[in-house]
Amino acid sequence: MRIVGWLLTISLVFWIGVASAANKVTVGLTSLSPSAMPIYVAKEKGFFEAEGLEIQIPVFRSGTENTQAVIAGEVQIAFGSVTEVFNLKKAKLDGRYFWGISNFMPFRLYAHPSIKSAQDLKGKKLAISNFGAQSDYLTQFTLRHFGVEPIKEAAILPIGSTPARYAALKSGRVDATIMWFPETLRAEQDGFKMLVDLNDIIPDWGYLGYYARSDYLKNHRETVIRYLRAHTRGVREVKSNPQAGIEMLKKYLKFDQAIAEAGYKEFVKSFAEDGRLPVKGFEFLLAEEMKSGEVKDKFTVADLIDESFVQFLRSSR
C-alpha cells in the first residue's frame, strides 16, 4: 500500500507539473504599441488568471527578433504583424496568424522638410527597425510604389524602434522614416513633412495580431482558446472603460495624459472583439512578396492563417 501511495503521489506531482507548464504562456510583443492595451488591461484585471493562465509579456525591439523567439520556442504566442508570418515561412517553419487585433494602417512616411515628395527620396537614407520587420517591408513597398528602387536608389538603415528612428530623423542621420503614433504627432509638431499616409496605398492591413507555430496551435488549442477569451474581455474593458486603456498607456508606454488620451482615441476604434483576420491585406502582401521575389515557395493565404479560432469563439458566444 505504501508503494501504491508513493506512486500516486509521484503521479500527482508529475501531473501538477505538466499542467502548470501547460498553463504558462509567453506572449512576445514586437513593440510597445497602443494596440497592446487589451493585453495589459486583461493582465492587470486578472482576466488571464481567471482562465487559469500565467502570462509573461517580453517586449522585443523588432518583429524580426520576435519571430526568432517564436522559432526558438521561447515565445508561444506572438503579438506582431502579418509580415512576421512570412518570416516563419522563409525559415521553413509552419506558422499561422490566427487572431486580428488592430486591422488598420497606422504608419505614415515622414521626411526632412526639404524633401517635397516620395519621388525625391532617390539618393536618400531611410530608417527601418530591422531587416525583415514590418517597417522594412512597408518602407520598401512604399518606395517601389513611387518609383524608387530600395537599396539601389535609396539606402535602408536598420535603426530600431519608432522612437529611435524618429531620433535619427531629427539628428539628420537619416532623411526619412515610416512612423506611427505618437511619433507622428511629434513629427507634425516639429515641422517634419508627411510624404505618404500608407492608408492611401495599402488596404485592410493587419497591423498587429496574434500568430504562433502551427504545432503549438494544434497541441495547445484549449490554452489558446482560454487566452483569447481573456484577451476579448480585455478588448471589451478597454472599449467600455476608456480610463483603463489610458492608464495602461501611461504606465507601460510612459505617455503623458494628453498623449495617452490621443493614443486611446486613435487606436481603440481598430480593436476587433471577434478577431477578424485581414484576408485582403494578406492577399495584397502575398502578391507583393511574390512579385518582389522575396518568397520562393508557392503558397496561398490559406497557408498563412488559421481561422478556426475566430470561427469557434464566434459560434460559442
Regions found by a protein language model. Give the residues of each.
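Pocket-lining segment of extracytoplasmic ligand-binding domains
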Residues: 83-84, 161-253
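Bacterial N-terminal signal peptides
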Residues: 5-17
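N-terminal secretory signal peptides that target proteins for export/translocation
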Residues: 1-2
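Boundary at the C-terminal end of the N-terminal hydrophobic targeting segment
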Residues: 19-21
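Secondary-structure end/capping motifs
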Residues: 218-296
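Short, glycine-/small- and polar/acidic-enriched structural segments
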Residues: 23-171, 175-181, 194-198, 203-204
